Every structure is written in C-alpha cells, then in structure tokens.
C-alpha cells in the first residue's frame, strides 16, 4: 500500500499544530505597531528558511521521497500560512493600518526570500552536500 497521503496528512497535522502554537505565543504588538500579525510573519520566515535548507538536501537526494513528502509537503505545508498571510494583510487594510500592511507584505516577501537563500547556502556549504 502507498502511504504517501498518510505521510502528507501526518506532517500537515504536526505543522498546523506548530503554527497554532507559534501564533498563540507571539505578541500582537511588534516594534512600532500596535497590531501586527507576528505569529504568521514568524512561521512564514521560519518556513522559508527551512524549505530552503531542506530543498537543497532533497535536490541532492539526501533523504527519500517519503520523508520529503512528510516534511516538506506535510510539516512545512501545514506550518507556513500564505492564506493566513493574505487574510491578515486584508484585515490590516480594512482597519486603515496601511503602514503595517505594507511593512508586513514587504517584510514577509523580502525576508522570506532571504531565509530561503540562507537555508540553501547553509545546507550546501555546512552540511557537506554539494
């Protein structure tokens, strides 16, 4: 029997639970902002870093397909929250919190890309998988 869907579902349950936890422990006041979706912001940046790291290892066949499905598709798919990111941005805009909304969008995208690049670089150069 093929367990690919089970691996993805199990990983998704773990990732979603971790996302919920991070969202609950993060404050809503951040830097100069009274209301900022720091939990969603954090999980997206962490997820970008980890997917960069794991993406390099997957490309070099360091682990099998089942683990890749479990971790990348399941755990990271459940952990990162692009749909929540869109909703959080819309809510900021609806409350006329334009500076927060723009900072959130630019910060998530720029820092997310940097996180992916750093994760890839570390996996490539320090794990010894070229």
Swiss-Prot record:
Which membrane topology describes this protein? Multi-pass membrane protein
Question: What transmembrane ranges does the database entry give?
Answer: 3-23, 38-58, 67-87, 102-122
Record entry for activity regulation: Na(+) is not transported, but it plays an essential structural role and its presence is essential for fluoride channel function.
Molecular function via GO: fluoride channel activity; metal ion binding
Catalyzed reactions per annotation: fluoride(in) = fluoride(out)
Q: One of this protein's GO BP terms?
A: cellular detoxification of fluoride
Enumerate the Pfam families for this protein. CRCB
Q: Which family does it belong to?
A: Belongs to the fluoride channel Fluc/FEX (TC 1.A.43) family.
Protein name as catalogued? Fluoride-specific ion channel FluC
Species this protein is from: Helicobacter pylori (strain HPAG1)
């Amino acid at each position: 029997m093929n367990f690919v869907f089970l691996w993805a579902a199990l990983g998704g349950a773990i990732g979603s639970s971790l996302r919920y936890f991070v969202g609950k422990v993060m404050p809503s006041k951040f830097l100069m902002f009274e209301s900022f979706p720091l939990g969603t912001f954090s999980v997206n940046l962490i997820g970008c870093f980890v997917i960069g790291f794991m993406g390099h290892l997957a490309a070099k066949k360091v682990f099998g397909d089942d683990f890749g499905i479990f971790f990348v598709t399941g755990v990271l798919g459940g952990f990162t929250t692009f749909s929540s990111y869109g909703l959080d941005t819309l809510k900021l805009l609806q409350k006329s919190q334009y500076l927060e909304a723009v900072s959130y969008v630019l910060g998530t995208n720029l820092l997310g890309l940097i996180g992916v690049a750093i994760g890839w670089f570390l996996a490539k150069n320090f794990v010894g998988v070229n």
